[in-house]
Design a protein with these regions (language model features):
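A general secondary-structure signal for short beta-strands and their flanking turns/coil
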Residues: 2-4, 60, 73, 86
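Beta-strand/loop substructures that line and gate deep hydrophobic ligand-binding cavities in soluble
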Residues: 66-126
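A short, structured loop/turn motif at beta-sheet edges
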Residues: 12-16, 55-59, 80-88
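Short, charged/polar surface micro-motifs in flexible loops or helix N-caps
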Residues: 47-50, 56-62, 70-71
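Hydrophobic ligand-binding cavity/cleft-lining segments
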Residues: 1-37
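Short beta-strand segments that buttress and anchor functional surface loops
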Residues: 40-46, 63-69, 93
Length: 126
């Protein structure tokens, strides 16, 4: 059975604004990140050399991304959907085969904290 976790957060912005803000936020959260010609961002993360690439479709609210570090690789679906005057950001985390259940749970906890910080930053420039 595949182990997954879902992170959901309401953001006090409309979908398009939230989408643009998340895209613009990545290089601010990770100042040493550099984008390569193939669309991959490279940086040193908590688990060593890391890369991330966004596969996006703004009109559909799709902001999926691939993340690879020295310990694991992730395909992360992310959706931004309308919720009245707000937007709902939904992130689905599937346990990579390389990680134990314990390691996955630890990573999910860190990602949840990052998502909480991201929400505060996204809403702070309203």
């Amino acid at each position: 059975m595949i182990k997954t976790r879902t992170i959901s957060m309401e953001v006090n912005k409309m979908v398009g604004e939230t989408f643009d803000s998340i895209i613009g936020l990545f290089p601010k959260l990770i100042p040493d990140a550099t984008m390569n010609s193939d669309g991959w961002w490279s940086f040193i993360g908590p688990y060593g050399k890391s890369r991330v690439k966004f596969n996006q479709n703004k009109s559909l609210g799709i902001l999926d991304h691939e993340y690879i570090d020295e310990e694991s690789s992730w395909n992360i679906p992310m959706r931004i959907i309308p919720n009245g005057d707000f937007s709902e950001v939904i992130i689905i985390l599937k346990k990579p085969e390389q990680l134990t259940d314990f390691q996955f749970d630890q990573r999910v906890e860190k990602i949840s904290k990052l998502a909480t910080s991201m929400k505060k930053i996204l809403e702070s420039d309203i």
